[in-house]
């Protein structure tokens, strides 16, 4: 199981290293799915959009960098990410955990090499 990011599928200004690393993570998961399938090993990716609550990444300079890149105040970060989603909802740690649980469960026993976006509908991250 890999936890990627919306940025694995959609670029963000000022985050090229992060976006590249997350895109590479998806491709690694695909390669491992191919290699592991004969052994019954499943490999999937959960791609969340910004998980603000409970994430330490937002306590450092990342918050300021993302606010500056999006031309908003740092206090408006969570609202900005919520409003840019089609469903107008925030993504929480438990949402990501539930997606991981699904892929780890027998309910997804016939799934490998897949990506599940947990982003409340971020259109730029739609797979094409």
Regions found by a protein language model. Name each.
Residues 10-16, 38, 88, 106:
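Active-site loop immediately N-terminal to the catalytic Tyr-X3-Lys motif
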Residues 100-101, 112-128:
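Short C-terminal tail/terminal secondary-structure segment
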Residues 36-38, 51, 104:
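A short hydrophobic alpha-helix cap/turn motif
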Residues 72-74, 85-96:
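A conserved structural motif in NAD(P)-dependent oxidoreductases
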Residues 21, 29:
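Active-site helix of classical SDR
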Residues 5:
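Residue(s) in the substrate-gating loop at a strand-loop-helix junction
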């Amino acid at each position: 199981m890999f936890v990627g990011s919306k940025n694995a599928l959609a670029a963000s200004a000022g985050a090229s290293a992060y976006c590249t690393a997350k895109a590479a993570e998806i491709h690694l998961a695909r390669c491992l799915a191919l290699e592991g399938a004969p052994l019954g090993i499943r490999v999937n990716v959960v791609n969340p959009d910004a998980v603000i609550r409970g994430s330490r990444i937002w306590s450092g300079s990342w918050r300021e960098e993302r606010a500056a890149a999006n031309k908003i105040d740092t206090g408006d970060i969570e609202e900005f990410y919520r409003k840019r989603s089609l469903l107008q909802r925030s993504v929480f740690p438990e949402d990501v955990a539930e997606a991981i649980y699904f892929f780890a469960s027998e309910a997804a026993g016939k799934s490998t090499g897949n990506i599940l976006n947990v982003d409340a509908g971020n259109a730029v991250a739609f797979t094409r």
